[in-house]
Amino acid sequence: MSLKKSPFFELRSGSVDTLLFIVKTADLDALRAELVKRFEATPEFFADDVVAIDVRRLADHERVPLDDIRGMLNDVRMRAIGVVAQPEQHAWAASAGLPLLEARDRRAPSSKAADEAPVQQAEPAAPAAGQAALFEQAGPTLADAGAPPESPAPAVAAQSATLVVDRPLRSGQQIYAKGDLVVLGPVSYGAEVIAEGNIHIYAPLRGRALAGVHGNHDARIFCTCLEPELISIAGIYRTTENPLPADVLGKSVQIRLEQEKLMIEPLRLT
């Protein structure tokens, strides 16, 4: 077999960000009712987003039919691409035909962990030796989903360079920054800005802003006019179905995490 580089395709080791859909109950009726309640008011919000079904929060004796959960997600236009499970769950989790994935979230969910938001950032598993993945977005080495939860990692001393975007972002556009992200134009409805570090928006934010996407709980979002579809830090998010109070809506604000809750505070610029 020739090792000459093909002009038609490449196979490279890599990673890709997606969302975790964390299953916290084996009661499918309750799960279905909550999905409908959460998304019926905003059916287009997560439309066509891909997710990994995370079953690590289930008790040892609990099992869920993953085909049924995949169908529920399809009903709200989310596409399941795999399953994140503890090693002892692999036998039944693999029965649905979805690939087993590894997660890179620093605080691996467990049935005994404190309650978290049901959607977090996740990643597909790194390829085994001798194999290659079809994803091509470079990222840090993935954490083993089966390993015990680690203590929160200290802040990284040397982050990637700040990315500056000096143009407006229209609906459907997405920007991803490995470090901090600075946006000098409006982020329109339907646009999305994502950063592993902080996000600074010196214009109206009307789309989605996700900071600290790889589990950086110290990340913050700053903007001069807050009118968002969604704001998120380290996977903990808030959407338009939870209206913002008048003292921050349309105002200059900073957004940070405090004890796993999003804190939205006015910025005093004068």
From Swiss-Prot:
Q: Where is the composition biased (Low complexity)?
A: 116-129
In the UniProt record, the signal sequence range is none
Q: Which UniProt keywords apply?
A: Cell cycle, Cell division, Septation
Single Gene Ontology BP term? division septum assembly
**Record's family?**
Belongs to the MinC family.
Q: What does this protein do?
A: Cell division inhibitor that blocks the formation of polar Z ring septums. Rapidly oscillates between the poles of the cell to destabilize FtsZ filaments that have formed before they mature into polar Z rings. Prevents FtsZ polymerization.
Q: Please identify the protein, giving its name as recorded.
A: Probable septum site-determining protein MinC
Query: What lineage, starting at the top, does this entry show?
Result: Bacteria, Pseudomonadati, Pseudomonadota, Betaproteobacteria, Burkholderiales
